[in-house]
């Protein structure tokens, strides 16, 4: 009887796990989020808390004010020397921009030899995303980076808005002398929008990639040389009678992600140069694929002259039917929630049952420093967020953790381990949009529930055998 009872407990645990996973509510052009989960995440799932930040999709949320107001642009220059400890964790961040200028999901490491930050993609992971906490509504954004390399590995530098507007640089690891540029308006896929710029080896060399975004035109430049110019008047669509030109406040994302993952759509795999090799030399040494970020500069431009202003702190959408520049206002609305139960509808929900927001930079899943084996004797630190990134989610019940970060040759080595032996990679299809190069975040509550249920299931199985 004890054995039967134990296995019944196991079955209940598994059933609970399945129910919780299947309870996810999705959002898209035909289905908006319900009021109890009002925010549509960038990846098409409804929820509260972090779902209401980080490019919350205003179009498919319960209402246009379900997403949190977006912190207004602030000109800045960020050098990523010894910067990992200053990063906020996107999975715990609740909107307090005084805590962090940049968020991460995935694995990041300081790289002292080049005074830079490594975005790492360990074997079978979804990659890493670095995101700004503030949005840019017209401005000049430049990033000095080294891309990754090899087939199936994609590096991205993009501006992306909660209305699906997008300005892109993407770099396919199989072609290191080409920067792919693209733009999207409200996520509309148009294959004629892309264009390439030739350059020198993007893996071996730092290049400064720049987006100079104005109301009526945008330029893409590499190392100060303009390689492409798009004019707003070129984007007019006679059918919709609208300019299909990126025009809404956008966050800055820099990422590395597995475009060649075998679970991706065939077109995505082909575009990224073929299936990714998870046993490539990089996976042995230094232990992951990587891109390197040295510096990002942001210069904010004035908003359109006819912008409605009732403050100076945040961008808000004023319409649930259109999401154009004319539908953006500048206000002093709150940009921070009190708990992961909050949303734009009620930022203070859950405040009485949750502790005061902690610094997101101090709640990273792990942080470690270790002496270098390299002759420079520099030190490294590494951080790993608690959810998979880059349009990928894992069935792993808990986060990976960086246990070491030592120098080996020219790159930092990170030992990444999982608390579950078996991981199943389920990467979503990418339809040509660089928005898929950013993190797929399931949220703290979902991650905690999955972890708790897996632990209970394993415990029950062990108990069943013992009894």
Swiss-Prot record:
Gene3D superfamilies (UniProt xref): 2.60.120.200
Compartments in which it is found: Secreted, Cell wall; Membrane
Catalytic activity: Random endo-hydrolysis of N-acetyl-beta-D-glucosaminide (1->4)-beta-linkages in chitin and chitodextrins
MF annotations from Gene Ontology: glycosyltransferase activity; hydrolase activity, hydrolyzing O-glycosyl compounds
Transcription regulation is among the record's keywords: no
Low complexity: compositionally biased ranges: 351-444
Post-translational modification summary for this protein: The GPI-anchor is attached to the protein in the endoplasmic reticulum and serves to target the protein to the cell surface. There, the glucosamine-inositol phospholipid moiety is cleaved off and the GPI-modified mannoprotein is covalently attached via its lipidless GPI glycan remnant to the 1,6-beta-glucan of the outer cell wall layer.
Disulfide bonds: 56-67
pH dependence comment: Optimum pH is 3.5.
Annotated spans, Disordered: 337-444
Known function: Dual chitinase/transglycosylase that plays a role in cell wall architecture. Chitinase and transglycosylase activities are coupled. Required for the polysaccharide cross-linking at the septa and the cell wall. More specifically, transfers chitin to both beta(1-3)- and beta(1-6)glucan in the cell wall. The minimal number of intact hexopyranose units required in the molecule of the acceptor oligosaccharide is two and the effectivity of the acceptor increased with the increasing length of its oligosaccharide chain.
Record-given protein name: Congo red hypersensitive protein 2
